[in-house]
Amino acid sequence: MAKELRFGDDARLQMLAGVNALADAVQVTMGPRGRNVVLEKSYGAPTVTKDGVSVAKEIEFEHRFMNMGAQMVKEVASKTSDTAGDGTTTATVLARSILVEGHKAVAAGMNPMDLKRGIDKAVLAVTKKLQAMSKPCKDSKAIAQVGTISANSDEAIGAIIAEAMEKVGKEGVITVEDGNGLENELSVVEGMQFDRGYISPYFINNQQNMSCELEHPFILLVDKKVSSIREMLSVLEGVAKSGRPLLIIAEDVEGEALATLVVNNMRGIVKVCAVKAPGFGDRRKAMLQDIAILTKGQVISEEIGKSLEGATLEDLGSAKRIVVTKENTTVIDGEGKATEINARIAQIRAQMEETTSDYDREKLQERVAKLAGGVAVIKVGAATEVEMKEKKARVEDALHATRAAVEEGIVAGGGVALIRAQKALDSLKGDNDDQNMGINILRRAIESPMRQIVTNAGYEASVVVNKVAEHKDNYGFNAATGEYGDMVEMGILDPTKVTRMALQNAASVASLMLTTECMVADLPKKEEGVGAGDMGGMGGMGGMGGMM
């Protein structure tokens, strides 16, 4: 296919036009007084959002070279969202600022490669300064404040996330679902829960809740289908003598085995319940092993030379209590050793770092949470579906931000941390004048997030930035109230990881764009006009009219 080429300044100007258009749309959402953006959908109601990455993802231009610039900055927002979960608007504003300042320098004849090296040196220095300024985020109050800021100053969201983290721990899984009412709700599932219920309703022993509840049961874990009762006789006899109930977790229990278990349960000979093992394939084997470690049991598997006929009570796990409903099984207070459980968690964490699949990482994180004890569900309440979507997106953003804060700590919010990190550039020198210019480009660019927050709030950006720069530490400007003061005391905090990733991703893409000298795109297809012969046919129609 034929290509169109653009070179030098012409190429960079086209790219810059796309970046500016995308950044203009994204930056209106920034800060406590940022506005919403309405996105058209191909079906259903439009989406209302204040999330930078959601806006960026929707934008595409017809002009190919403009679009290439916009797509590269979109990558900045997406990468920041994927790694830090928030800070997408900050990243976009920073990328645009670096590119605008850098383009002026390139147009003035400076070497783009040296500018890039200067920018990279400056980013490294600012990143180290941010990490030195970072304070650990340990208490619920700080977690709530981070959540509140990320959820667009919604204190209810910050509070519910802090409460959820307090209940399930920093490593616990917190999921966000659609609620039924107008208020946000938090429910916590203690112990390990997996999404498999009883195989037969005849196992129910609590008619009121339609559940099967077992107190201090044995747990038999089998990684194959059980269809013959003969295989299980020795285990069943041992359990019956002990007088304790039994939970069977197997790939499936069917036929004669299921019928015998149901009859024994109904007659009260052995109080028993059977459920299918969670997951599929290798994940099922791994989850069975998780349950075994949690309950101090053994998985009966022919792969490791254990047969069901030879199983004894020593191979069975134990727990304080088990509740089985139609859809879920919850193991509460398994009797596994803490050291073994922690070793298993460490092993799964190592797998999380190695995996490249987001889906696998999410599933591994769920397994960690189930072993660590607890899953919290935040149900988001809203009056309409449009509001529900918008609110749910804010809750998810806030959740990512609080996780990032717990991971790497917090710095003063509202763009103050970046202004303070400018100090790291005072003594930084490049190898030549062009590199020094690159350092100065970043010095100016890191003021842009605060400038945009202040502008969106209706104040004069230069006045505020200069006043904040004159002071030290956490002194900054609260754009929500129009007051100056200590940002940390006012509860305006940003996760260090979010600020760091936004800066690194923005500088990475913007400096690459500065070093662009040629752009290649497909030529637009020429639409073939309606053939002349067809028009002639139309003329013939006129002739027919004359015949009438």
From Swiss-Prot:
- Alphabetical list of PROSITE patterns matching this protein: CHAPERONINS_CPN60
Q: Name one Pfam family in it.
A: Cpn60_TCP1
Q: Where does ATP bind?
A: 29-32, 50, 86-90, 414, 478-480, 494
Listed GO cellular component terms? Answer: cytoplasm
The EC number on file is 5.6.1.7
Reactions the enzyme catalyzes: ATP + H2O + a folded polypeptide = ADP + phosphate + an unfolded polypeptide
Per UniProt, which keywords does this protein have?
ATP-binding, Chaperone, Cytoplasm, Isomerase, Nucleotide-binding, Stress response
Where does it localize? Answer: Cytoplasm
Q: Which InterPro entries match?
A: Chaperonin_Cpn60_CS, Cpn60/GroEL, Cpn60/GroEL/TCP-1, GroEL-like_apical_dom_sf, GROEL-like_equatorial_sf, TCP-1-like_intermed_sf
GO BP, sorted A to Z: protein refolding
UniProt GO MF annotations: ATP binding; ATP-dependent protein folding chaperone; isomerase activity; unfolded protein binding
Keyword match Isomerase: yes
Q: What are the TM regions of this chain, as residue ranges?
A: none
Q: What class of enzyme is it?
A: isomerase
First-listed, main subcellular location of the protein, grouped into a coarse class:
cytoplasm
**What PANTHER family does this protein map onto?**
60 KDA HEAT SHOCK PROTEIN, MITOCHONDRIAL
Q: How does it assemble?
A: Forms a cylinder of 14 subunits composed of two heptameric rings stacked back-to-back. Interacts with the co-chaperonin GroES.
Q: Which NCBIfam families match?
A: GroEL (TIGR02348), PRK00013.1 (NF000592), PRK12849.1 (NF009487), PRK12850.1 (NF009488), PRK12851.1 (NF009489)
Q: In which family does this protein belong, per the annotation?
A: Belongs to the chaperonin (HSP60) family.
Q: What does this protein do?
A: Together with its co-chaperonin GroES, plays an essential role in assisting protein folding. The GroEL-GroES system forms a nano-cage that allows encapsulation of the non-native substrate proteins and provides a physical environment optimized to promote and accelerate protein folding.
Name of the protein: Chaperonin GroEL
Q: Which organism is it from?
A: Legionella pneumophila (strain Corby)
Source organism phylogeny: Bacteria, Pseudomonadati, Pseudomonadota, Gammaproteobacteria, Legionellales
